[in-house]
Amino acid sequence: MSNMTPKNIVKELDSHIIGQHDAKKAVAIALRNRWRRMKLDDSLRHEVTPKNILMIGPTGVGKTEIARRLAKLAKAPFIKVEATKFTEVGYVGKEVDSIIRDLTDASVKMIRLQSIEKNRFRAEELAEERVLDVLIPSVKNDWGNSENKKEPSKTRQNFRKKLKTKELDDKEIEINLASTPIGVEIMAPPGMEEMTSQLQSMFKNLAGQKQKPRKIKIKEAMRLLIEEESAKLINLEEIKEKAVEAVEQNGIVFIDEIDKICKRGEISGPDVSREGVQRDLLPLVEGCTVSTKHGMVKTDHILFIASGAFQVANPSDLIPELQGRLPIRVELSALTIEDFEKILTEPSASLTKQYSALMATEGVIISFTQEGIKKIAEAACQVNDSTENIGARRLHTILERLMEEVSYNASEWNGKKINIDADYVSNHLDKLVSDEDLSRFIL
């Protein structure tokens, strides 16, 4: 993390997201400040709280993607939630505390996978031994004890080499594996997910882990045995402690569509999903303690990134207390034709590269010319202007329509080369783009 300076973070984000430099800069500084905070003395560290961010911009310009890429970069627990899914405490629906519970679950899963990866080498060794015990049963002496445990036989070593070189992958063996307990499905009303989870866990523990003989190929047996041995090597209590700490110190919560819970002046009467939800969010963002099945989680140092299009409402329509808890405001600009061109070519997994790779699996060679890419970008921009502006998501619709014929016939066009230039794009899209009614329903 020490080498992830704000400039390096922005550079990394640039390889996936086009434009929006101000937003990238804001999240890069927020991430770097976390590293700086961990270098402080304990007395001062607890006083430094993250500066939460409010992203304002139309749909499809990269708000969600910036937060998602940031979490991957930081290897931090991350969750994305829609503000519209929550209701005020006391009403039917999800309560905002479930955000932290879900974030903690995600953290436990992340730490568990890291722990499994860390112990993978040892788990592979133990899995190998179990397979070898089946292939070469140990010889019993007169007292019924297994011999040659300390000094592996030459045959065992030969089989071990064959296992490592995957020569025995297709050989079938019968081996005892932990049977999966029968799942108990419990239907619960919204807001009662925690109770459901605890009941399912209780039934699972009552069933216990039983060994069941199965006849499978060695390749599959090794995979299942590695999973089983990895699970034995990890300490669940330690994982829970690390997961809770990771959430408290590095957790990132992305709240999308926050503009949809703004209470506008002209609306009167009770509204469960608006001002009440904002008030329930206040303690979470300010800092409180939430009870989860993995332990108590303090939210004081969790970074909250809220976003919204704010096409109907304004940021000033949020309740003043919540506005004060989102001190950093970043405005994301609408995408231009030049941005669309860059989106189609520059990211490491751009849409044009994805389609070329997909068609290459069937032997069809796709190439996009610069003129063709410009024409696609112009078409996307034109449809966005004439109908609803959905930003870069329009490119998915346009390209899917453009590639429809190739995708449908790819299995019969093995070895064919298709050059997508300006003429190709015009022939396939001009009629749809120029006809506003068709654009509205098809593109």
Curated annotation (Swiss-Prot):
Organism: Wigglesworthia glossinidia brevipalpis
Single GO cellular component term: HslUV protease complex
One Pfam entry name: AAA
Record PANTHER family: ATP-DEPENDENT CLP PROTEASE ATP-BINDING SUBUNIT CLPX-LIKE, MITOCHONDRIAL-RELATED, ATP-DEPENDENT PROTEASE ATPASE SUBUNIT HSLU
Subcellular location per the Swiss-Prot or TrEMBL entry: Cytoplasm
Lineage of the species this protein comes from: Bacteria, Pseudomonadati, Pseudomonadota, Gammaproteobacteria, Enterobacterales
UniProt family annotation: Belongs to the ClpX chaperone family. HslU subfamily.
Gene Ontology process terms (BP): protein unfolding; proteolysis involved in protein catabolic process
GO-annotated molecular function: ATP binding; ATP hydrolysis activity; peptidase activity; proteasome-activating activity
Source taxon at top rank: Bacteria
Role played: ATPase subunit of a proteasome-like degradation complex; this subunit has chaperone activity. The binding of ATP and its subsequent hydrolysis by HslU are essential for unfolding of protein substrates subsequently hydrolyzed by HslV. HslU recognizes the N-terminal part of its protein substrates and unfolds these before they are guided to HslV for hydrolysis.
Subunit structure and binding partners: A double ring-shaped homohexamer of HslV is capped on each side by a ring-shaped HslU homohexamer. The assembly of the HslU/HslV complex is dependent on binding of ATP.
Name of the protein in its database record: ATP-dependent protease ATPase subunit HslU
Gene it is expressed from: hslU
